[in-house]
């Protein structure tokens, strides 16, 4: 095990835009799933998740579109660190459970796998009122200034729906694929992917 990790943004300046986008969304998923985890959720992981999301969400597009923007790159690294510390204390869940077989069978990069299923898992989870309330709590950290313009006086469910739509739009703006078929995954593979996701009992 390493004794330390150095977050040097200079080393990430050459990272391609699509890799920056996928790894950035992956880090956001770490924080979102840690905050909404039914296993070991705690005040420390919550704090780390929220601050990680604030940094990641507010710097993702700058890092994607301006690869040499060291401030954005540095903030992405710090946000990813916080998100990693969050899910080290409160584990990830269904997004990752679904992402693993996508990578294992179709060699989809891990960050992209998470990005493909994130909105759909959130929409499914939001049928539960507690999950919707937790997503709503994260909305201002993810949406930033966009949150105050859209959220006044609406329910947790409506805030969550707005947040999911916001995330889908942001993923689209990064240029990442949005659908499984865009990654050449056939429809008849879906039952197998779902079955294998259910085997990830440590995450569900």
Positions of the model-derived regions?
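Carboxylate- and glycine-rich phosphate/diphosphate-binding segment that chelates Mg2+/Mn2+
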Residues: 1-90
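Short, flexible active-site recognition loops that position polar ligands and cofactors
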Residues: 18, 40, 183, 200-204
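Short, amphipathic C-terminal "tail helix"
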Residues: 186-204
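Gly/Pro-rich interdomain helix-loop hinge
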Residues: 105-189
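Short, well-structured alpha-helical segments that form the helix of a local strand-helix-strand
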Residues: 73-81, 160-164, 191
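Glycine-rich phosphate/pyrophosphate-binding beta-alpha loops
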Residues: 81-114, 200-204
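Short acidic alpha-helix initiation/capping motifs at coil-to-helix transition points
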Residues: 51-54, 92-93, 166-175, 193-197
